[in-house]
Amino acid sequence: MTTILKHLPVGQRIGIAFSGGLDTSAALLWMRKKGAVPYAYTANLGQPDEDDYDAIPRRAKEYGAEGARLIDCRKQLVAEGIAAIQCGAFHNTTGGLTYFNTTPLGRAVTGTMLVAAMKEDGVNIWGDGSTYKGNDIERFYRYGLLTNAELQIYKPWLDSDFIDELGGRHEMSEFMIACGFDYKMSVEKAYSTDSNMLGATHEAKDLEFLNSSVKIVNPIMGVKFWDENVKIPAEEVTVLFEQGHPVALNGKTFADDVEMMLEANRIGGRHGLGMSDQIENRIIEAKSRGIYEAPGMALLHIAYERLLTGIHNEDTIEQYHAHGRQLGRLLYQGRWFDSQALMLRDSLQRWVASQITGEVTLELRRGNDYSILNTVSDNLTYKAERLTMEKGDSMFTAEDRIGQLTMRNLDITDTREKLFGYAQSGLLSASSATGLPQVENLENKGK
């Protein structure tokens, strides 16, 4: 059976991921006019720029949807976001600033939950607004087929008939008006925005040019921290974790994780925390550029990693970072539920996150400027008395350290021999521009 349909399947049920915007509205109406039977499915992901979810299914019905459902995905989205924090599943960083994979997390939840809802309604053809150049077309493809093995894909934006008739936003708007809907195009921004409760992505248009900076963006989850006219007073915040799970902010507990994440967003957003500018590699290996917001994820991530470094040993932390980057890349590629990702998630959550219990106090200032003021945990392996410079009882003596250093003579001698070998083969040469001249007899050994 063909998985991807190039032309509209007339007379058949088609589920469309419906946002209520111009693109999906025009696509739904066009499919109905051409003889298909569209069903609209809208994901409530707690988008910060959406204020009336209930109105979206009603609009879909007006445009010809046979059925329209609003699927609440917030609980599942936050659960996956917390799992990503526990695993450090983030692979794109620039200058120490992290992209928290908020769009890939949203696609993992949307792609599975909407297709599951379609399957309940006997709808086995799915369409969405992703384009052939982006990541989402592959993410949705993978998650959709994982959820429903019988699924077929129809995307109006891959259908030449749709493109010929409604290839641009102006044509879509004119089509809506001609069909009796007074649908006016929204004012074009200098970039496009996609968001969910975990974060916002700003990209394309003017942001495709690297000389367009974050300063052209109007944050939807935070503030313009770069604008000196925006007053941002410093704020102390406490974050409490229990077995890797964030449970309290400023001493306040929450009825559920959704409310906790909303409060984390409010706190971090007041400062513009978690905003970053990234150049990344798309799944197809072409580079793209995005400006991201994720105030709540950033706040929780900072506190989590502070506890991590105080609780676990160096080798465990190294594995956390290495496996986390690997897992982050799988998440980005739409493989969050693949076996290799589940294996990494299980080990990181079981052996790392389970020990992360404690409270971190931070002072947030402007943007990503913050200080850690205190770290408290019964699980800390950081013990100030072990390395104190003051007199007193110690777990080891100066004589112990002399013995330990003497044992290092073995590998130091081996290293000197290797340096000499490198010099003899021409790989290394003594130079005033390096520290190598200080290695005695590097060039003169044996002369």
Curated annotation (Swiss-Prot):
Q: Which SUPFAM superfamilies match?
A: Adenine nucleotide alpha hydrolases-like, Argininosuccinate synthetase, C-terminal domain
**Binding residues for L-aspartate:** 131, 135-136
List the catalytic activities from the record: L-citrulline + L-aspartate + ATP = 2-(N(omega)-L-arginino)succinate + AMP + diphosphate + H(+)
**Residues given in the record as L-citrulline binding sites:** 99, 135, 139, 192, 201, 203, 280
User: What are the BP-aspect GO terms?
Assistant: argininosuccinate metabolic process; L-arginine biosynthetic process; urea cycle
Per UniProt, ATP binds at 17-25, 43, 129, 131, 136, 194
GO molecular function term, any single one: ATP binding
Tell me which Pfam families the record gives: Arginosuc_syn_C, Arginosuc_synth
Q: What keywords are assigned to this protein?
A: Amino-acid biosynthesis, Arginine biosynthesis, ATP-binding, Cytoplasm, Ligase, Nucleotide-binding
The UniProt entry, under HAMAP family, shows: Arg_succ_synth_type2 (MF_00581)
Protein family: Belongs to the argininosuccinate synthase family. Type 2 subfamily.
Q: What is this protein called in UniProt?
A: Argininosuccinate synthase
From which organism does this entry originate?
Klebsiella pneumoniae (strain 342)
